[in-house]
């Protein structure tokens, strides 16, 4: 499923990545993804989408719901961060603070599910540029093209464990810019 798709995309479409010749070490013949937890950020666990995004992107954001400022700017291992949006998304959603505050405000149930996070480990053998190209293509084709907003943060502490956090809206955006029913 998901990991096989990523592996195939890495071989076929990552600039500078060449498939090893037949008989080469199996580790060189394909990309291995060792880790892929998927989690839900929900209000009943006392979490907010704004706080989670600030943490993952190592930024400072204000939650307009309760006035809390979340400052994670001292984190130094975020190599790349980007908000990826469907074409019809309101342009202001390119600002992660606006996007996730909109999500927090749109969910009114006390046990509301706010966002989904996907974490993927990447091969240390690829360069940051190759990993970012792979991440962007995967997120675009798998989520954004289906109307989801994605907040992407690529982390590398230099410990041989480069990985990406993909934070997704639970609802797709409709063509008119309004939130659709939840995607489960």
Question: At which residue positions do the language-model features occur?
Answer:
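N-terminal nicking endonuclease/strand-transfer module with a His-rich metal-binding environment
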Residues: 1-184
């Amino acid at each position: 499923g998901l990991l096989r798709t990523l592996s195939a995309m890495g071989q076929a479409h990552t600039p500078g990545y060449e498939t090893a010749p037949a008989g080469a070490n199996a580790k060189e013949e394909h990309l291995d993804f060792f880790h892929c937890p998927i989690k839900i950020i929900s209000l009943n666990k006392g979490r907010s989408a704004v706080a989670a995004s600030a943490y993952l992107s190592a930024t400072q954001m204000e939650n307009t719901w309760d006035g809390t400022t979340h400052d994670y700017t001292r984190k130094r291992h975020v190599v790349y961060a980007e908000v990826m949006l469907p074409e019809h998304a309101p342009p202001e959603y390119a600002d992660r603070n606006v996007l996730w505050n909109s999500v927090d405000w749109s969910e009114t149930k006390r046990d509301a599910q706010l966002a989904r996070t996907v974490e993927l480990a990447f091969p240390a053998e690829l360069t940051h540029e190759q990993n970012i190209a792979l991440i962007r293509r995967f997120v675009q084709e798998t989520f954004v093209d289906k109307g989801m907003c994605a907040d992407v943060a690529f982390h590398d502490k230099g410990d041989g464990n480069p990985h990406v956090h993909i934070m997704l809206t639970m609802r797709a955006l409709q063509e008119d810019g309004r939130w659709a029913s939840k995607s489960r």
